[in-house]
Amino acid sequence: MNRQLMEAYIRQKRASPGMVQASDLQINRPMSGMRSNSRELHAYDGPMQFISSPQNPDQILSNGSPGGITPVAMNTSRNHSNNMRSLSTINQEADLIEEISSHELEDEESSPVTVIEQHQQSASHSANSTQSQKPRARQHSFSDNLDEDDYTNRNVAGAAPVRPAGMASSPYKDATLEGSSNGTGNGTGGESEGDVIGNIDQFVMQPAPQGVLYKCRITRDRKGMDRGLFPIYYLHLERDYGKKIFLLGGRKRKKSKTSNYIVSCDPTDLSRNADGFCGKLRSNVFGTSFTVFDNGNKESTESPRLDLAVIIYDTNILGFKGPRNMTVILPGMTEDDQRVKISSADPKQQGILDLWKMKNMDNIVELHNKTPVWNDETQSYVLNFHGRVTQASVKNFQLVHDSDPEYIVMQFGRTSEDVFTMDYRYPLCAMQAFAIALSSFDGKIACE
């Protein structure tokens, strides 16, 4: 009976809060990620021979009675020296862990970093707090420089279509507006990103205003029974915060002797008889020449079918490897920034292609793809797409005029397997730019 009482007494004494438990110096971080005002209490690992003074925690007192009785004889000077060294080591580790945790909490803060100025500090701040703020300010300054350099490197890495070409980092830095009324103008100084104005069917046919850049994205849908051979292409205008506005959809007609694409502003009905039918793209037998038409009727005299563009790809009969060479002929622009009406269906006048073959350039504008530069380091052709194109493709191109090769009228390139970017400016409209991009998708027997 006495033995059982003794064991119960010992178990109760060991479980009492006065006994010191072992601790591994873990710091409990709050789940919310916010600062915690509570401080961790650290205990000494192993049997305790000394206790700390309640007035001064750093002062070590002998484990004796309050009356000052001498310590137990088992405590030798050697044990005392070892315990003193262990206590000093534990205190240093605790200070180090506390300092590391404070830096980790600083890194988790999302508030903006402000420069610490000496004249704004209150006189009540002690010298210790001032000294502790200086390394924090240096740490934030280093973090700011690191973030800025990392952002710059990311921009440089995305400046070329696939790899950095060492070109200008500012998009269209020296571009001048072709056809401006005063003959001058900077492509970036007063340039803004375009938005949809009015109805979609009217907007896609209207030439882009001068000084406005339209950033678009083309997605290719190859899902379904026959989408592998006849995919559907969707054109969206990119807006802020990842938003996008649908503009046009296009698909290749199945029963056609040559490549024939239907373009509509109604994504649910991509047929020629649909209300949203905007025009079509038709190629020759070899796929080297494409003509873009609007939604007019070639048999009608009141609203005849108009020519919007002609795209010509240079033939590559010998099969030399390299980028495509393309020529784009557009109708000229009037003084009020409207297209000159040219119709190949009208027997009284010549079409765009006929005018170009006869070198009659009065009412047409000729564009060419910008010649890419060969990079010996990457063993590839590179162009500066200013971060808008991220993957190499034979379809990537930029359209420029010979009089001003720095003014990018249109650029097109791949960002993923079925996603492409398409940016265009004056004098193109969305219908013309989308049709030019569709011609790049089409297979070309004599150009590959």
Swiss-Prot record:
The parts of the chain that form a coiled coil are none
| GO CC annotation, single | ciliary membrane
Provide the residue span(s) of the region labelled Disordered.
Answer: 103-195
Where do Gly residues bias regions lie?
182-191
Which positions does the record annotate as the modified residue Phosphoserine?
A: S141
Could you tell me where this protein is found in the cell?
A: Cytoplasm; Nucleus; Cell projection, Cilium membrane; Cell projection, Rhabdomere
| Sequence ranges of Low complexity compositional bias | 118-133
The membrane-topology field of this record reads: Peripheral membrane protein
The family database entries (InterPro entries) matched by this protein are listed as: Tubby-like_C, Tubby_C, Tubby_C_CS
Q: Name any Gene Ontology BP term.
A: protein localization to cilium
What keywords does the record list, in alphabetical order?
Cell membrane, Cell projection, Cytoplasm, Membrane, Nucleus, Phosphoprotein
What's this protein's family per the entry? Belongs to the TUB family.
State the protein's name.
Answer: Protein king tubby
The species is Drosophila erecta
